[in-house]
Amino acid sequence: MFSKSYQITKEMYEARGWQIIKEDELTILAKVNSRENTNPEFAIAKFIKTTQEIKSPPLSQIIDFSSNEYVCVTIICDGSITTNVKKIEQTTKGKVEIFHNKDLQMNITKYHLQPLFNKLLDEEAKDFKKKYIKCKIENGKKIILQSFPSMSKSDPIARFFKYQSGDVIKITNKDGFVSYRIVK
């Protein structure tokens, strides 16, 4: 049932720079390589048949959502994703991400026309914003004088790479043309 989405989830974790350290039939555990934190951090992917299992005690016994052990909990379900289930994503502030099984049937980054996406490092992003985004402060409010192309946080590519608001993304097309987007 999850064979294709299981493989795509592994590819997604590897594309994020995470190292798969353990896997079984319905779980993938990965070590998150972080530049900022020297303590080991982990991400876990769980494959479940229905969204009812998300609320049930068995899942909360397996994954402690308040724990700092996991920086990312990816849930892939085959049932319908209700608004109550989507609220879990919002209330955990990006720690939990929920994908429907059908959304992970193809690796969108491997499509032959898909450009390359690279997140700028923190220092590079800071310099980029300083150079290209003009703003002023008026009455204590920051006013942006020059808008910049953006990418929604809910964009499939942003979700695939787990881009966060404020990230600057360098996009390189197959012909070598480079453009930038800021995740909103």
UniProtKB/Swiss-Prot annotation:
Keyword Transcription: yes
Keywords: DNA-directed RNA polymerase, Nucleotidyltransferase, Transcription, Transferase
Gene Ontology BP, a term: transcription by RNA polymerase II
Family annotation (Gene3D superfamilies): RPB5-like RNA polymerase subunit
Claim: Transferase is one of the keywords in the record: yes
One Gene Ontology term of the molecular function aspect: DNA binding
One Gene Ontology CC term in the entry: DNA-directed RNA polymerase complex
InterPro entries tied to this protein: Arch_Rpo5/euc_Rpb5 (IPR014381), RNA_pol_subH/Rpb5_C (IPR000783), RPB5-like_sf (IPR035913)
Domain of life from the UniProt record: Viruses
Family designation: Belongs to the archaeal Rpo5/eukaryotic RPB5 RNA polymerase subunit family.
Task of the protein: Component of the DNA-dependent RNA polymerase that catalyzes the transcription in the cytoplasm of viral DNA into RNA using the four ribonucleoside triphosphates as substrates.
Protein name: Putative DNA-directed RNA polymerase subunit 454R
Organism encoding this protein: Invertebrate iridescent virus 6 (IIV-6)
Classification lineage: Viruses, Varidnaviria, Bamfordvirae, Nucleocytoviricota, Megaviricetes
